[in-house]
Every structure is written in structure tokens, then in C-alpha cells.
């Protein structure tokens, strides 16, 4: 009798543990993913202003259409992608939820009200409905249909970063200060065909903000070769896991490279700046 009670008790205990474990896991998963869902912001050694003896500000462009950078762009659909989000929707949803503040300028001095952001980038379509009354008279009524924000035409990302020499560690380091999404301005011509009218910088996201750091540290990047260990967006930027090209260095005229060079000359200027940054630290120790 005692053994029977012991078996029953063991069975009930096992069953209750199984039920609790099942409730902990998300539907569609076979193991607890809490370790990959809750991450702390990467710790960095603080930099003292007195230790910075040289610095240079650089603006560079990441093009999502480049094969290596396509994980920034996909998935550009917002619905039906499980928990996957591209970088644009990661930031956009945080704006909608009032979790972060974005700025008009790359100096991060002019904050944009989140409600204004929603109105600015939510498009409006006008549909005309044909209404016929009992007497056969036809009238037209306009119906305003809001069109949700879409990342489909956002193909580029601008980074603002600072390169600096820290005498405390005798090394050149780099810190990304902020990012900005660039959207293609597509409009219909007279024949109804969409044509590119230019590009628009949407807003600047301050990567030094604690709220933004927390957001990026807990938002994951989909890479199809290892779903069990997906990096966070914070890790992507920290390890500089992207291809990019320089579009501006800090200068007294506040000009971009495209303002004074075109074509191959612009490419050569970008390469010259990149090379100067790369060799700066090496040249310091040459005698």
C-alpha cells in the first residue's frame, strides 16, 4: 500500500512539473527561450573627457540592397512573420509605444513628438465611392483611408560615429552616436508609373540613449544559419557587422562628399578618408 501511494505521488509530481514547464514555453517552441529573450545592455568602460586627445566625426551609409546587409531590410512585411522584425519596425514600434525619443537633427538637439512622427509618416489615401439614391441620382463621397507606415521603400541607413584616441589605453576606438533611416521618395508620373524623385532622411535615433540601448539589446536579428543564437541589434553595431561607405567627414563647411565630388572622384575621396582613419593609429607609433 505504501509503495502504491509513493508511485501515485511521484506520478502526480512529474505530471505537475510537466504542466508547469509546458506553460512556461511559448506555443510552437520545444525549449525555454528566456535566456535569449532577456539580455542586459553591453557594458563598456566609461571614457573620461581628459583622456580623449584626438577625435574625428564620420558619417557613413549602409545600403540594405547589398547582399551582406540584407538582414537590415528583411522582413519588410510587418504582419505574419512570427516574432521577426527588421531594424526599421523595431524602432518604429518603440516610437508608437513611447519607449524612445527620436530627433530631427544629427546633433540630437531637436526632439520630435511621437504623435507628430505618427502623423508625418502615416499616409492618407482618398477613395471616392459612387452612391446612387432611389431616384437614380449618382453622387460621389470621399472616404479617407489611413495607410500604415511601411519599411518597403527604406533601403539605406546613415550612421554618425566618432573616432577618438584614448590616451588611457593608447588606442583608437570608435563609437556610433546615432542612426537615421533613408526612404526613397517614389511618386507617380503622368502615366501612373512610379519614379524616384530623391530620398528623404526620416529621423535620427540616438544610440547613446539608455532607452535605445535597452531596445537594441533585446531586439534580435534574424540570420538563417543559426536560429538558436541570434545576435541583438546592439551586438551588430558594436561588432560593426555590416558593410558601409563614408559619405562625410567633419569639416568647416559642413559638406558631404557628394557636394564637392562626383562619380569616381567621390569614391576615391571616401576611400582616402577610410584609409586615413585606418592608418592613423599605426602612424602614431612610427618613429
Regions found by a protein language model. Name each.
Residues 164, 169-172:
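A sequence/structural signal for flexible, mid-protein segments enriched
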Residues 171, 176-194:
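Extended serine/threonine-enriched, polar tracts that run as long, contiguous segments within proteins
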Residues 1-27:
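Bacterial Sec-dependent N-terminal signal peptides
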Amino acid at each position: 500500500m505504501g509503495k502504491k501511494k509513493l508511485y501515485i505521488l511521484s506520478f502526480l509530481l512529474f505530471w505537475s512539473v510537466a504542466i508547469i514547464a509546458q506553460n512556461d514555453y511559448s506555443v510552437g517552441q520545444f525549449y525555454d527561450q528566456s535566456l535569449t529573450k532577456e539580455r542586459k545592455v553591453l557594458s563598456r568602460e566609461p571614457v573620461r573627457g581628459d583622456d580623449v586627445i584626438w577625435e574625428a566625426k564620420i558619417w557613413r551609409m549602409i545600403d540594405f540592397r547589398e547582399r551582406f546587409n540584407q538582414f537590415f531590410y528583411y522582413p519588410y512585411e510587418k504582419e505574419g512573420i512570427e516574432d521577426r522584425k527588421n531594424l526599421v519596425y523595431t524602432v518604429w514600434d518603440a516610437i508608437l509605444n513611447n519607449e524612445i525619443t527620436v530627433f530631427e537633427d544629427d546633433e540630437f538637439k531637436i526632439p520630435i513628438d511621437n504623435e507628430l512622427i505618427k502623423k508625418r509618416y502615416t499616409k492618407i489615401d482618398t477613395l471616392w465611392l459612387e452612391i446612387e439614391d432611389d431616384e437614380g441620382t449618382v453622387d460621389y463621397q470621399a472616404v479617407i483611408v489611413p495607410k500604415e507606415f511601411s519599411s518597403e521603400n527604406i533601403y539605406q541607413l546613415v550612421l554618425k560615429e566618432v573616432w577618438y584616441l584614448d590616451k588611457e589605453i593608447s588606442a583608437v576606438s570608435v563609437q556610433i552616436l546615432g542612426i537615421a533611416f533613408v526612404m526613397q521618395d517614389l511618386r507617380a508620373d503622368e502615366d501612373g508609373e512610379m519614379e524616384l524623385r530623391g530620398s528623404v532622411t526620416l529621423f535620427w535615433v540616438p544610440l547613446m540613449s539608455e532607452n535605445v540601448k535597452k531596445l537594441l539589446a533585446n531586439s534580435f536579428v534574424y540570420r538563417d544559419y543559426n536560429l538558436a543564437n541570434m545576435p541583438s541589434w546592439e551586438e551588430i553595431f558594436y561588432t560593426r557587422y555590416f558593410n558601409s561607405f563614408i559619405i562625410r567627414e567633419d569639416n568647416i563647411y559642413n559638406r558631404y562628399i557628394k557636394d564637392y565630388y562626383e562619380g569616381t572622384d567621390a569614391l576615391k575621396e571616401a576611400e582616402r578618408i577610410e584609409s586615413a582613419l585606418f592608418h592613423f593609429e599605426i602612424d602614431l607609433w612610427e618613429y
